[in-house]
């Protein structure tokens, strides 16, 4: 690549300049923030609650721990972690998108969750936290939207304490051909129509379907985590691999 030539990346199936992707992703989430929780329930038939509950169960969160809920959006995981870490613990709900962060803050405060939760607008590629700060980091359905995933994983590793755990919950690749066919049909034909009906925004849900297909598969993401410095990395497929939970440790 010659000097001055723009580097490119993907935004769904489109090729865009690297410095434009964050702005485009921001536009998607500004558009859907107000109806994000409703769409999650509708498009996953409520199964996202099971995926998130399993993530919480394997997190090992205990009273007094510091947890970073990265790309935490409307705060589903933060709400659970707040209860688990208690008054002596701390949960940081971080998201690059201020619209999502505002929805999350309002939702949690309306539930009376205020004492041990703070809110930070942050870019996963350059987290504004000290080294070795958190016991647990989660990023649920957010990594695929990050422009430089390798940089983000290294940043997470930096702010995680030795002995700490990273949990990456993300859409992945179905394991069986019949499921792949059904999933593709649903994603590209049904999902955008749901988006249009509920949020008046079909394009954002077309991007969702495309971004899932462009995201690294289970084994590729596992190796990316290893390359970023995580150890004992493994993953669990859920719903035939439509979603996978990756786990890695910092020692």
Curated annotation (Swiss-Prot):
This is Ubiquinone/menaquinone biosynthesis C-methyltransferase UbiE. Methyltransferase required for the conversion of demethylmenaquinol (DMKH2) to menaquinol (MKH2) and the conversion of 2-polyprenyl-6-methoxy-1,4-benzoquinol (DDMQH2) to 2-polyprenyl-3-methyl-6-methoxy-1,4-benzoquinol (DMQH2). Belongs to the class I-like SAM-binding methyltransferase superfamily. MenG/UbiE family. Keywords: Menaquinone biosynthesis, Methyltransferase, S-adenosyl-L-methionine, Transferase, Ubiquinone biosynthesis. It catalyses: a 2-demethylmenaquinol + S-adenosyl-L-methionine = a menaquinol + S-adenosyl-L-homocysteine + H(+); a 2-methoxy-6-(all-trans-polyprenyl)benzene-1,4-diol + S-adenosyl-L-methionine = a 5-methoxy-2-methyl-3-(all-trans-polyprenyl)benzene-1,4-diol + S-adenosyl-L-homocysteine + H(+). One of its GO terms (molecular function) is 2-methoxy-6-polyprenyl-1,4-benzoquinol methyltransferase activity. InterPro entries: SAM-dependent_MTases_sf, UbiE/COQ5_MeTrFase, UbiE/COQ5_MeTrFase_CS. It comes from Shewanella baltica (strain OS223). One of its GO terms (biological process) is menaquinone biosynthetic process. Gene3D superfamilies: Vaccinia Virus protein VP39 (3.40.50.150). It is an enzyme of class 2 (transferase). Pathway: Quinol/quinone metabolism; menaquinone biosynthesis; menaquinol from 1,4-dihydroxy-2-naphthoate: step 2/2; Cofactor biosynthesis; ubiquinone biosynthesis. Its EC number is 2.1.1.163, 2.1.1.201. It holds the Pfam family Ubie_methyltran. S-adenosyl-L-methionine binds at residues 74, 95, 123-124.
